[in-house]
């Protein structure tokens, strides 16, 4: 799997028109896109279907969490849409229900561990006694036990997570920032090079590409950095 299959560009824009222009600008350089709530609520599900039909891969970032039956029903419908990845919060019952619902569909289910915008203070405020690292590892183990296809975590935890989940699960890391980039609202960040070296399989990059003066140049620079991290292993 090369850099192009590993880079996921976050379409974190408010309208379908802006998303269409960005996809057109990035052209064949980018294969994989993330679509989340912002775009979904602007009509993004139909846009996601169209992108998938055109040959792009779609990571639908819905972070589902509900009672088992509701999660299963939602996953069954999403599995029919041609999406490549879907997120849900890494709670054991929800994950098990989702895995059963997605069986045989080819949809890769990802368990969200701890948001990269959260640190220990944020977790404490939310009532958690564990630090981010410990909670990520616990939820990664639960995701593996549930039969999930991968997890979402900070690249800071990727190496430790790999030891828990084994060699086959995807490790998808947001909070990717090239050297010199503004962190924005992210708190646990890493460069593309370091994230891949730490064991991430896929990198989610939004603002450093979307908000760049030339998004295509920004994407190509990140892809080049990723290639250098993968060489000579070419994983």
UniProtKB/Swiss-Prot annotation:
Pathway: Pyrimidine metabolism; UMP biosynthesis via de novo pathway; UMP from orotate: step 2/2. It comes from the Bacteria. It is an enzyme of class 4 (lyase). SUPFAM superfamilies: Ribulose-phoshate binding barrel. The active site is at residue 63. Transmembrane segments: none annotated. Its EC number is 4.1.1.23. Signal peptide: none annotated. GO terms for cellular component: cytosol. It catalyses: orotidine 5'-phosphate + H(+) = UMP + CO2. The keyword Lyase applies. Gene3D superfamilies: Aldolase class I. GO terms for molecular function: orotidine-5'-phosphate decarboxylase activity. Homodimer. Belongs to the OMP decarboxylase family. Type 1 subfamily. HAMAP family: OMPdecase_type1_B (MF_01200_B). This is Orotidine 5'-phosphate decarboxylase. It comes from Rhizobium johnstonii (strain DSM 114642 / LMG 32736 / 3841) (Rhizobium leguminosarum bv. viciae).
